[in-house]
Regions:
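Short amphipathic alpha-helices in soluble, non-transmembrane regions
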Residues: 67-75
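C-terminal binding/interaction regions
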Residues: 173-191, 239-295
Length: 295
């Protein structure tokens, strides 16, 4: 039987369904998973959609994803390889009445990762286009309830137009920094008294380069935070001007830099430290600025 195409009004439960499925996916991908995102129409509040949860994962190694095909099948996924897009791994769940789709790319594949995030973020912030897209999809679903090819072809022109517009306005710098930080974040047991990698950080310099670092934890408080490690890498490479900073905990959440690190940056850039942006909430893209630390 062909897939039955239905387009329904936005459902707040879609976000919860994404979160539940993301936990299962991260458990299977384990340390190979760098980042995971809710994408597609169900990720856009207020947008009517087919009730299918689209999920994108960025990984370090696609071959390890292939090795996990059996594990995905155990939670109901059909593993379809690239499925028409080079460098992707595509999985779907639910058969003809599909419920979830996963699109997996390596972290270096910014073209594919970026276009998905750009389209999503644009739709989240542009109501006129969001409403127009919803109308197009509802009309097509009524006209072609069992013809997915006609449904997709019917909205292709609009999607490509919006994707081009979205990419022209998209600043994916925070996303690139997040991926760079997560890509080096893994626990390293260096000795019985020293471990590293629980927290990672990325900084963007005034020259547009990204430097990363991981925390070093010791038994006697002689370690180094991830932010200062990233700054050390920047200075080693002959730069000293910071524009943005993101620190990430072991659960993938953005965290503010510690007081000592903030004070260090005010000394590094005494006349310009207040212009350094720090990411406070990566999922919702909320950021702030460095303020002088007072103990």
């Amino acid at each position: 039987m062909s897939q039955h195409i239905t387009v329904v009004d936005y459902n707040p439960l879609w976000a919860k369904k994404y979160e539940e499925e993301a936990l299962l996916i991260k458990d299977i991908l384990a340390d190979n998973c760098v980042a995971i995102y809710h994408i597609g129409s169900t990720s856009v509040e207020g947008l009517a959609a087919k009730p299918i949860i689209d999920i994108m994962a960025a990984v370090q190694n696609l071959e390890k994803v292939d090795d996990a095909a059996e594990a995905f099948s155990k939670i109901g996924y059909e593993y379809l390889g690239e499925f028409g897009i080079a460098g992707r791994r595509y999985l779907r769940k639910g058969g003809d009445e599909r419920t979830h789709q996963i699109h997996i790319f390596q972290t270096e594949d910014w073209n594919n990762i970026g276009r998905h995030l750009a389209f999503r973020d644009y739709m989240r912030t542009h109501k006129k286009e969001r409403d127009e897209y919803a109308k197009i999809k509802k009309v097509l679903a009524q006209k072609f309830p069992y013809d997915i090819d006609e449904y997709c072809d019917g909205k292709e022109e609009f999607v490509r137009k919006i994707e081009k517009l979205a990419l022209s306005q998209f600043d994916g710098t925070w996303d690139k920094m997040y991926l760079a930080a997560r890509n080096v974040q893994k626990k390293r047991e260096i000795s019985p008294l020293v471990e590293a990698g629980g927290v990672s950080a990325a900084i963007l310099t005034e020259k547009g380069n990204i430097y990363v670092g991981v925390c070093i934890d010791t038994a006697c408080s002689l370690g180094m935070c991830a932010e200062r490690n990233a700054i050390a890498n920047m200075i080693t490479n002959g730069e000293n001007g910071i524009c943005r900073l993101i620190a990430v905990d072991r659960n993938g959440k953005a965290i503010p830099p510690c007081g000592a690190c903030r004070e260090f940056m005010t000394q590094l850039m005494p006349d310009h430290y207040h212009s350094i942006q720090i990411m406070l909430d990566y999922e919702n893209k909320k950021n702030g600025y460095i303020r002088r630390y007072h103990s």
